[in-house]
Amino acid sequence: MMEFKKNYFWHVSVIIIGLVIGLVHHIYIYPNFFHADSAAYQVLASAIRDEGVLLPHDFFYGNQLIMLKISPFIALANYIGFSGYKAYAIGGAIAICVWFYICNLIISKYCGNKYFSLLLSTCLFIPLGMDDIDFLLGQESHLSNVVLSIMICLPVIIYIQESKKSFLCISALAVILMTAEQPIRTLIIIAPFILF
């Protein structure tokens, strides 16, 4: 029972750290960089809320379905009762929290040390330049790609080292998710694996 409480506390702590990173970024950093591309995700979130579907009719694209981006999380914040930039900030923080948690889980399986994996995950989610501020943590247009790429590569490495087929399933799930959203980018990421 004590082990369960210890693990539960650890997972809740990781989630809170991810949420804090998202809130700090969207409240104190990103308002200075918010622009029309970011607002497009907010418009998509409004359409998700109004139509009640993840892929609204007017936003269905052939090569990019944008379902793993920030918009569903903004729509969730809208449902909760937030509006305007507050909905964007809360939704963005929730999205960062989700991707941070997934990233930390995968890295911890690879490293075997939960503290070191938390440090690596935190370093990954600290913006070091304008692209990180805008694309990775602001619009979050590339955040899912980064985490899913980690989710593709590290389990394959673990499979090669330990021959555990469950890690191939995790990698395959990431490929399927990425392919469903962005087929062309997925091809770029998995092309090196095809060569081997």
Predicted segment positions?
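Membrane-interface junctions at the ends of membrane-embedded or membrane-associated helices
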Residues: 1-6, 56, 109-110, 156-169, ...
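Start-transfer (signal-anchor) and selected internal transmembrane alpha helices
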Residues: 1-23, 167
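Transmembrane-helix motifs of polytopic, lipid-linked glycan transferases
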Residues: 16, 90-115, 151
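Aromatic-anchored segments of alpha-helical transmembrane domains
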Residues: 20, 122-130, 175-181
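Membrane-proximal lumenal/periplasmic loop motifs of glycosylation machinery
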Residues: 27-36, 49-72, 79, 85-86
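Specific aromatic-rich, kink-prone transmembrane helix
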Residues: 40, 102, 142-163, 167-170, ...
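Membrane-interface micro-motifs in multi-pass membrane enzymes
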Residues: 63, 67, 114-160
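Membrane-interface alpha helices of multi-pass inner-membrane proteins
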Residues: 167-186, 190-195
